[in-house]
Swiss-Prot record:
Its EC number is 3.4.24.-. Belongs to the venom metalloproteinase (M12B) family. P-I subfamily. It is found in: Secreted. Ca(2+) 1 binds at E196, D280, C385, N388. GO terms for biological process: proteolysis. The lineage of its organism: Eukaryota, Metazoa, Chordata, Craniata, Vertebrata. Its main location: secreted. Snake venom zinc metalloprotease that may activate prothrombin. Gene3D superfamilies: Collagenase (Catalytic Domain). This is Snake venom metalloproteinase AaPA. The active site is at E330. GO terms for cellular component: extracellular region; plasma membrane.
Length: 413
């Protein structure tokens, strides 16, 4: 039986109106300081897991009490999830971390049907939640020996660059066809698909994060946890099959030209990566500043193609969610989804994921057009690689010694 932990957190909130603070997401104004306090221990005799399957937190937002319900995202990793990095002498080192007891959750606010949440509970609470149409971010404050967290709206994060950023896909890349009305599209549970992806982190990212592989991994995990929620509306499960870090040098020529980099990355995947890790799609994450306003590029309607089921994404923001949405955008191109036009909608007042321009708004949803285009692409092309449902990590429990298994690429000392 799954152990369920009901944790009540009393968050005493003290708004700092007009003040600012430097957080991981940047300089933030108008935030609330909150102190999580666990009030309800586990039942007597219960065995506490490091990260429980279900958690609930109670706190106040703007003086109003809310209950945040979280459930572990058990489909986040594939059962054979692997991580790859390289030694200084060029050896490829493959490990299989034990990811069953991870700390990434999805959830909602109790009594708010439209609420959502994506939270990391690894070191305090970090992530975002939607409450009554407003999106809030939460993260631990950088105070020694303190449980203080900051809760704030994204609009209160000072923007380093106000210029609009864009996806590099243009009409020359996209094939425009008439879009069916939603009433013309038959949808059933048979349309559920499963996309196993590999994220490749280039050497510019390693430099940006000062070689801190743990920080890079956490950044990627949080991104994938965020986009799994967005893709659930398209009836597509996103599963992370692998993370490769080019720790010593790039294995392709990563250029400021997004188009050239995409081409090189696709060719490398077809001749190398696809033979090492079972996956359906690969995305390159880079700190390289692409030419012009471009922050991402992907082939359109290319899922399962060895060279073309790929995308490239610039790590363009200190706000994880914004980079995650860019990743979700490029992956959707691979699934036959085009840029939104004027008639497309994902709710009144919202900018949708497939907008060609990425601005400072918090984006979360695919539009009705994206939904229809994705369904049409799957119905027409039926890409075979995303048909199979992979086993979840919690279905396999193989005892091992240590935290990792090293494959043959690494010489044992």
């Amino acid at each position: 039986m799954i152990q369920v932990l009901l944790v009540t957190i009393c968050l005493a909130a003290f708004p700092y109106q007009g003040s600012s603070i430097i957080l991981e997401s940047g300089k933030v104004n108008d935030y609330e300081v909150v102190y999580p306090q666990r009030l309800a221990p586990l039942p007597e005799g219960a065995v506490q897991q490091k990260y429980e399957d279900t958690m609930q937190y109670e706190f106040k937002v703007n003086g109003e009490p809310v209950v945040l319900h979280l459930e572990k995202n058990k489909g986040l990793f594939s059962k054979d999830y692997s991580e790859i990095h390289y030694s200084p002498d060029g050896r490829r080192i493959t490990t299989h971390p034990l990811v069953e007891d991870h700390c990434y959750y999805r959830g909602h606010i109790r009594n708010d049907a439209d609420s959502t949440a994506s939270i990391s509970a690894c070191h305090g609470l970090k992530g975002h939640f939607k409450l009554r149409g407003e999106t809030y971010l939460i993260e631990p404050m950088k105070i020694s020996n303190s449980e203080a967290h900051a809760v704030y709206k994204y609009e209160n994060v000072e923007k380093e660059d106000e210029a609009h950023k864009m996806c590099g896909v243009t009409q020359n890349w996209e094939s425009y066809e008439p879009i069916k009305k939603a009433s013309q599209l038959i949808v059933s549970t048979e349309f559920q698909r499963y996309m196993e992806i590999v994220i490749v982190v280039d050497h510019s990212m390693v430099k940006k994060y000062n070689g801190d592989s743990d920080k890079i991994k956490a950044w990627v995990y949080e991104m994938i946890n965020t986009i799994t929620e967005s893709y659930s509306y398209l009836y597509i499960d996103i599963i992370l099959s692998g993370l490769e870090i080019w720790s010593e040098k790039d294995l392709i020529n990563v250029e400021t030209s997004a188009e050239n980099t995409l081409k090189s990355f696709g060719e490398w995947r077809a001749k190398d990566l696809i033979h090492r890790i079972s996956h359906d799609n690969a995305q390159l994450l880079t700190a390289t500043d692409f030419d012009g306003p471009t922050i991402g590029l992907a082939y359109v309607a290319s899922m399962c193609d060895p060279k073309r089921s790929v995308g490239v994404v610039q790590d363009h923001s200190s706000v994880n969610r914004l980079v995650a949405i860019t990743l979700a955008h490029e992956m959707a191109h691979n699934l036959g989804v085009r840029h939104d036009e004027g008639s497309c909608s994902c709710g009144s007042g919202y900018t949708c994921i497939m907008s060609p321009v990425i601005n400072s708004e918090v984006i979360k949803y695919f539009s009705d057009c994206s939904y229809i285009q994705c369904r049409e692409y799957i119905s027409k092309e039926n890409p075979p690689c995303i048909l199979n449902k992979p086993l979840r990590t919690d279905t396999v429990s193989t005892p091992v010694s240590g935290n990792e298994l090293l494959e043959a690429e690494k010489d044992y000392d």
